[in-house]
């Protein structure tokens, strides 16, 4: 393997029309890697910091020229000459250069762009697909897609409180079949919503964003769409929710304000509500059911539902091994959402996935609401045999780019490809 000879960053746009960072890395022996950095709408308090310029005269203050400059002026001179294959050493160098706990000096968007582009350049130099370069020849498990087909909360301008209602085609025999099932249900949902007189505009992640009467109506409508598409809810297709409760939590009164429904709930009442929903609908996964700082609430939720429902920590764990270790020790949750830009380097991302698996927690590799055509997370999902991926509806190119990459990977793997379906939920006690 050869050394890095050039690193270059530029400002480009993400799927929401906001600026983001793109990084290119070149090696001595002709390796080339390009990576684009995603951005979240509902962000965790403890996430690595995304550097924005704050100049209101440019992109309403959301420019990333400072992050781009940090790559070109500070990071590039330090990593040019380093061995491109030494991902851990390069990521360690990036962390040292920044010197802060949350990557606020150089920006997680600058650091991540470099980290991912380095991996792509190394894979390119070796002539290997990225998933195989990162995961070796054991990388062959295709993830079950967690498809966000109905949006609310911070991802849509409507009166639905829960941020994401998702389907998981666990009964499929292959990823290709799972994607087809998801797409058919998505189109079926559009027809169901139209028949009810609801809007079929889509939100940030490609799901529909109608003004429904209640959060429960969203679940009922999706069940109707699954059946209309010819599938069996609870057998072939399960439901998942991302509540994004930190967006509902009021710090002043310590309660959850479901404004769409006009109700206020305590932590205990939220847990009781989830128990009721799980008893009525085939819900297999709940993400961020309580506020990121409501550890007692999360512990109660885990005690009540942790054996039969995947309880995913997103804002709770922020892809951070310190936060995850605390959760494991306290018996909170049984799954972690993996977002590369929450932590900022590929090495730290892999560390979080490894820690989760060792503790019997699942790892769900995830996009952000502000995405790009970059499909790296598809390769990461296969490289780590994560078993689950959350990357939006089968709609909008920024989401479909990941699904199409997984189709390519499944084709490349041929008969060695594995689609585990319901077996991906090894954290649940049957």
Swiss-Prot record:
Cofactor or coenzyme needed: Mg(2+)
UniProt pathway: Carbohydrate degradation; glycolysis; pyruvate from D-glyceraldehyde 3-phosphate: step 4/5
Active site (UniProt): 205, 339
E.C. designation(s): 4.2.1.11
Keyword Lyase: yes
Enzyme superclass (EC): lyase
Localization per Swiss-Prot or TrEMBL: Cytoplasm; Secreted; Cell surface
GO cellular component, one term: phosphopyruvate hydratase complex
GO molecular function: magnesium ion binding; phosphopyruvate hydratase activity
Superkingdom of origin: Bacteria
Binding site residues for (2R)-2-phosphoglycerate: 163, 339, 368-369, 390
PROSITE patterns recorded: ENOLASE
Free-text remark on how the cofactor is bound: Binds a second Mg(2+) ion via substrate during catalysis.
Coiled coil, from the record: none
Keywords linked to the UniProt accession: Cytoplasm, Glycolysis, Lyase, Magnesium, Metal-binding, Secreted
Any one biological process term the GO annotation gives: glycolytic process
Reactions that this protein is recorded to catalyse: (2R)-2-phosphoglycerate = phosphoenolpyruvate + H2O
Binding site for Mg(2+): 242, 287, 314
Family: Belongs to the enolase family.
Entry function: Catalyzes the reversible conversion of 2-phosphoglycerate (2-PG) into phosphoenolpyruvate (PEP). It is essential for the degradation of carbohydrates via glycolysis.
Name of the protein in question: Enolase
């Amino acid at each position: 393997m050869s050394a890095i000879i050039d690193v270059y960053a530029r400002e480009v746009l993400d799927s929401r029309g906001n600026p983001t960072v793109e990084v290119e890395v070149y090696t001595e022996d002709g390796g080339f890697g390009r990576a684009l950095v995603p951005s979240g709408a509902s962000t965790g308090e403890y996430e690595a910091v995304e550097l924005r310029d704050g100049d209101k005269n440019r992109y309403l203050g959301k420019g990333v020229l400072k992050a781009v400059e940090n790559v070109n002026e500070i990071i590039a001179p330090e990593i040019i000459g380093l061995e491109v294959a030494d991902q851990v050493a390069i990521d360690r160098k990036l962390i040292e250069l920044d010197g802060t706990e949350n990557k606020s000096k150089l920006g997680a968007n600058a650091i991540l762009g470099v980290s991912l582009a380095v991996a792509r350049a190394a894979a390119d130099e070796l002539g290997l697909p990225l998933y195989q370069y990162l995961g070796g020849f054991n990388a062959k498990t295709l993830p079950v897609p967690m498809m966000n087909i109905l949006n609310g909360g911070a991802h849509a301008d409507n009166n639905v409180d829960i941020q994401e209602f998702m389907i998981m085609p666990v009964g499929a025999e292959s990823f290709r079949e799972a994607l087809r099932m998801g797409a058919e249900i998505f189109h079926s949902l559009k027809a169901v919503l139209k028949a009810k007189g609801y809007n079929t505009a889509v939100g940030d992640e490609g799901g529909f964003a109608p003004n429904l009467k209640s959060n429960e109506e969203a679940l009922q409508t999706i069940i109707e769409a699954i059946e209309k598409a010819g599938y069996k809810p609870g057998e072939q297709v399960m439901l998942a929710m991302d509540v994004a409760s930190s967006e509902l939590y009021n710090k002043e009164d310590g309660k959850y304000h479901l404004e769409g429904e006009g109700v206020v709930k305590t932590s205990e009442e939220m847990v009781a509500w989830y128990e009721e929903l799980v008893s009525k609908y085939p819900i297999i996964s709940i993400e961020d059911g309580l506020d990121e700082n409501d550890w007692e609430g999360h512990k109660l939720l885990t005690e009540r539902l942790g054996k039969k429902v995947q309880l995913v920590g997103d804002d709770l764990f922020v892809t951070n091994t310190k936060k995850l270790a605390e959760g494991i020790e306290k018996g909170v949750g049984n799954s972690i959402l993996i977002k590369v830009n929450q932590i900022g380097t590929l090495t730290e991302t892999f560390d979080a996935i490894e820690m989760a698996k060792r503790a019997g927690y699942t790892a769900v590799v995830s996009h952000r609401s502000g995405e790009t055509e970059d499909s790296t997370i598809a390769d990461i999902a296969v490289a780590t045999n994560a078993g689950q991926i959350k990357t939006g509806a089968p709609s909008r190119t920024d989401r479909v780019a990941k699904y199409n990459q997984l189709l390519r990977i499944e084709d490349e793997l041929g008969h060695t490809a594995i689609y585990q379906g319901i077996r991906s939920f090894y954290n649940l006690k049957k």
